[in-house]
């Protein structure tokens, strides 16, 4: 595994993670669909996880990989709760457009 990282280089992993994170930010800021925004947040989380794994492999330390394992478990719970909330919103409003959420009474 270390040979692959040396051949590719840590800089390329950093560039890839920055590009993925920027795609996620773009999706959150410029899209109004809740599912697209939710997927964009997951892309941002995966970019950070990839960076953790790349740095932990580069420094030959497993702590970053262990952190990513727990982060993925939390992300799975986040996906379950987030999709349940989106399904509930769709049932009430028949739309998942973020602009329609201001019509909800709390």
UniProtKB/Swiss-Prot annotation:
Gene Ontology terms: biological process = ATP synthesis coupled electron transport
TM stretches of this protein: 8-28, 35-55, 66-86
Instruction: Give the catalysed reaction(s), semicolon-separated.
Output: a quinone + NADH + 5 H(+)(in) = a quinol + NAD(+) + 4 H(+)(out)
Membrane topology listed for this record: Multi-pass membrane protein
What Pfam families does this protein map onto? Oxidored_q2 (PF00420)
Keyword vocabulary terms for this entry: Cell inner membrane, Cell membrane, Membrane, NAD, Quinone, Translocase, Transmembrane, Transmembrane helix, Transport
Q: Where in the cell is it found?
A: Cell inner membrane
Q: What does this protein do?
A: NDH-1 shuttles electrons from NADH, via FMN and iron-sulfur (Fe-S) centers, to quinones in the respiratory chain. The immediate electron acceptor for the enzyme in this species is believed to be a menaquinone. Couples the redox reaction to proton translocation (for every two electrons transferred, four hydrogen ions are translocated across the cytoplasmic membrane), and thus conserves the redox energy in a proton gradient.
Q: What is its EC number?
A: 7.1.1.-
User: Which family does the similarity line name?
Assistant: Belongs to the complex I subunit 4L family.
List the InterPro entries: NADH_UbQ_OxRdtase_chain4L/K, NUOK/Mnh_C1-like
Q: Name one GO cellular component term.
A: plasma membrane
**Which GO terms label this protein's molecular function in UniProt?**
NADH:ubiquinone reductase (non-electrogenic) activity; quinone binding
Coiled coil ranges (UniProt) are none
Q: How does it assemble?
A: NDH-1 is composed of 14 different subunits. Subunits NuoA, H, J, K, L, M, N constitute the membrane sector of the complex.
**What is the name of the protein in this document?**
NADH-quinone oxidoreductase subunit K
Q: Does the keyword Ribonucleoprotein apply?
A: no
Q: Where is this chain primarily localised?
A: membrane
Q: Which Gene3D superfamilies match?
A: 1.10.287.3510
